[in-house]
Amino acid sequence: ILGLTAIGEDPANVAGYHLLAALSDYDATTQPGVTSAAYVLLALDCGNYEIPKTEAGKTQATREMYVDFMLGKQLSDGGWAIGAEEADPDVTAMVLQALAPYQSNTAVKNAVSLGVQRLSKLQNDDGGYTSWGYTSSESCSQVVLTLCALGISMDDSRFVKNGHSVLDKLLTYQLSDGSFCHEDSYDAYATMQALCALSAAVRQQAGKRAFFTMTDAAKQTHAPQSGVAAHTAQVEALPAFSDISGHAN
């Protein structure tokens, strides 16, 4: 949903599938944990989508329910985690990104304030973060996304340790070919997260909307394809090689 919205496509009609429909089932979407609820809310809010009506017998989800679920999972130290009693920087960052647009609610505003304080305390002396005993670029990326979502400068003193910002630390993970590493070698997931974080930072510097607010994405104007049959026809129309044994890719 996030990817489709970013390129101007409609997630309510993808080859006949309504991808938003799955987000209407509160029990199913919250069962995996707090990060699942966070990304459901990010997906709904990225295009300001309405939550579809869920199937009979299932619990109808609302934005308020997702917000309350995340608030209820906040730890006593101010952060969030999965299966732990102490805050994890990645999980805390993801939840704060989702809660950022709801700070007109006093309870949310207070929770966000505590979460930001905890993220600041979790930062290492070199500007980075440690999650589950490992330092990685992904943790830095999530915090950069969070600061941008909350309108906090990369140079905010709360997130600069010994002259090193979290953005400074993130850039140390970039390899010579432009990709990013998880710890010391190329990692696709790390690269994807780093690009999202850097895009968010660029958007913030340019005064644009937050990264996950995609209502300014240019909408595609082509007529939607209906169902699998239309796509099958497209595949069948592709040129075929009678003998591919010697064909170079």
Locate each region found by the language model.
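Solvent-exposed, low-complexity, repeat-rich "mucin-like" stalks and linkers
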Residues: S242-A248
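Terminal, non-catalytic domain-edge segments
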Residues: K169, E183-F241
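A conserved helix-loop-strand patch within extracytoplasmic ligand-binding domains
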Residues: L20-T30
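Gram-positive cell-envelope targeting signals
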Residues: A194, A248-N249
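Alpha-helical scaffold repeats of the Armadillo/HEAT/TPR superfamily
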Residues: H18-A21, K58-A61, M65-Y66, A111-G115, ...
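An alpha-helical repeat/solenoid feature that recognizes helix-turn-helix modules
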Residues: I1-N13, T29-R63, D68, L75-S113, ...
